[in-house]
Swiss-Prot record:
It comes from Gloeobacter violaceus (strain ATCC 29082 / PCC 7421). It is found in: Cytoplasm. The active site is at residues 359, 390, 510. Pathway: Carbohydrate biosynthesis; gluconeogenesis; Carbohydrate degradation; glycolysis; D-glyceraldehyde 3-phosphate and glycerone phosphate from D-glucose: step 2/4. SUPFAM superfamilies: SIS domain. This is Glucose-6-phosphate isomerase.
Length: 548
């Protein structure tokens, strides 16, 4: 199916060509000069919305840059594409699906139409069932097979069925029930499962198996290992229904596994895995923090959805961050984006955003199936501050690669232990200042540094950063933050003319692995028909495996 959204190829659009010319004019301008020319730049190039303060003044851009980027968004029919998504059009063209993760956080009573039906009542029916179940587990009403209270919840899932809940559990740990632990089994590596269950009691453990089809290889391998572990300790098939629930739509397989389908929580084809943490996939999150905090997170998601849908582009947080990112990706040739949260609880945010961004926009053909002639999604990486300052910040400051950075911080800490937070935030502010303005040779020389050491002590500066500041990390703020990045990724995908909601790139490796598994398990020497490298690796593995 072809797209009707972008009839003119991206690089032929007037705004793109104007941006290319504009880049040549300002590419060498230093942030020192931009701030010297405009003493109010720090206030002018900032946006306050939805509880966030975005300072984008330390970016290598001008008013004209922003104007041209906004025109590019208009030429890409961004407003039309936003409405198409929110209204349930099948904008995931390769899979012929609507993209309605925004419906997961729509308030009760809202109307979101998909294939002629309002999906909101069903969304809230699932949320209500989740809340009832979460309260039973948290309150001790739900008991294990031997009558003991559940002390640990293990989420079994991979990809979007793991990264979102894992990130959210850490992010909201301050709000969680500390007497109830949540762990995650994702990797098919048996060591992951072994460590997850290492010190657990089967009769105090609840497993949530997250797989829409209930056939996902990694998830079901871990689920069956968990089932065997429970049965070995409890000795009765009837125990499975007390220690397993499912997030799935395949009732037949769920029931076959031994799970009561009354404890199966569904979600829909219009929810992509990487956009599903606020669906039933978030059941472990709801159990950890409680329904009230989970619903507060949903309210945050929805508030950012409405901001994205209604705010003009120049006052729109996701659009502005998307356009700035595109400016570096497509004109400065930056290949990565560092996400640097200065909050311990957001330690897993970079890994979550890796999947969100790289699986969405890591595409080499456009929505019409044509090869792109420009760079698409960046590499996303990062680590919490101040840890990263003592590892990779050296390269950002003095290396040869341009690495735009998103700094995320909070004015109030959830754990006021003096003087920790002031020291943390002093580093937060200092890093963006140092990256922007650096340290000149004259400044270093004035400190009495020896001539031979001067080149090593100079900081070029002109390293671009966004600073995203909020009051404090709450469930609502987390929802807003994740929705901000969701819509940022969507905006960039629209301009690049991509289908940001499929992920065919993950399929080929899975298919090949399915062929190789019997070759590794076979008692007889298999006849291999791979390339010479893969054949040799398989034979070496089989020899070493036999010696174990």
């Amino acid at each position: 199916m072809t797209s009707t959204f972008a009839p003119t190829p991206l690089t032929q659009r007037a705004a793109w060509q104007a941006l290319a010319a504009h880049y040549e004019q300002i590419r060498e301008i230093h942030l020192r000069a931009l701030f010297a020319e405009d003493p109010s730049r720090g206030e002018r190039f900032a946006l306050e919305a939805e509880g966030f303060y975005l300072d984008y003044s330390k970016n290598r851009l001008t008013d004209e840059t922003l104007r041209l980027l906004s025109v590019l968004a208009e030429e890409s029919d961004l407003r039309g594409r936003i409405e198409a998504m929110f209204s349930g059009e099948k904008i995931n063209t390769t899979e012929q699906r609507s993209v309605l993760h925004t419906a997961l956080r729509a308030p009760r009573g809202a109307t979101v139409i998909e294939d002629g039906e309002n999906v909101v009542p069903e969304v809230h029916a699932v949320l209500d069932r989740m809340a009832e179940f979460a309260d039973r587990v948290r309150g001790g009403e739900w008991r294990g097979y031997t009558g003991r209270r559940i002390r640990t919840v293990v989420n079994i899932g991979i990809g979007g069925s793991y990264l979102g809940p894992d990130m959210a559990y850490d992010a909201l740990k301050h709000y969680s029930d500390r007497d109830l632990k949540v762990r995650f089994a994702a990797n098919v590596d048996g060591s992951n499962f072994a460590e997850v269950i290492h010190d657990l009691e089967p009769d105090e453990t609840l497993f949530i198996v997250c797989s829409k089809t209930f056939t996902t290889l990694e998830t079901m391998t871990n689920a069956h290992s968990a089932r065997q572990w429970c049965l070995a300790a409890l000795g009765d098939e009837q125990a499975i229904a007390k220690h397993f629930v499912a997030v799935s739509t395949n009732a037949a397989e769920v029931e076959k596994f031994g799970i009561d389908t009354a404890h199966m929580f569904g979600f829909w084809d219009w929810v992509g895995g990487r956009y599903s943490m606020d669906s039933a996939i978030g059941l472990s999150t709801m159990i950890a923090v409680g329904p009230e905090h989970f619903r507060a997170m949903l309210a945050g998601f929805h508030a950012m959805d409405e901001h994205f849908r209604t705010a003009p582009f120049e006052r729109n947080l996701p659009v502005l961050m998307a356009l700035i990112g595109l400016w570096y990706n497509n004109f400065f040739g930056a290949q990565t984006l560092a996400v640097l949260p200065y909050d311990y609880y957001l330690g897993k945010l970079p890994a979550y955003l890796q999947q969100l961004d790289m699986e969405s926009n890591g595409k080499h053909v456009d929505i019409d199936g044509q090869p792109v002639t420009y760079q698409t999604g960046p590499i996303i990486w990062g680590q919490p501050g101040t840890d990263g300052q003592h590892s990779f910040y050296q390269l950002i400051h003095q290396g040869t690669k341009l690495i735009p950075c998103d700094f995320i911080g909070f004015c109030q800490t959830l754990n006021p232990i003096a003087p920790h937070h002031d020291q943390l935030m002093a580093n937060f502010f200092a890093q963006t200042e140092a990256l922007a303005f650096g340290k000149t040779e004259a400044e270093v020389r004035a400190e009495g540094v020896a001539d031979w050491l001067l080149p090593h002590r100079v900081f070029e500066g002109n390293r671009p950063t966004n600073t995203l500041l909020a009051e404090r990390l709450t469930p609502e703020v987390l929802g807003k933050l994740i929705a901000l990045y969701e819509h940022k990724v969507f905006t960039q995908g629209v301009i690049w003319n991509l289908d940001s909601f499929d992920q065919w790139g993950v399929e080929l490796g899975k298919v090949l692995a399915g062929r190789i598994i019997p070759e590794l398990e076979s008692a007889e020497e298999p006849e291999l028909a791979h390339d010479s490298s893969t054949n040799a690796l398989i034979r070496r593995y089989r020899r070493a495996k036999r010696q174990n």
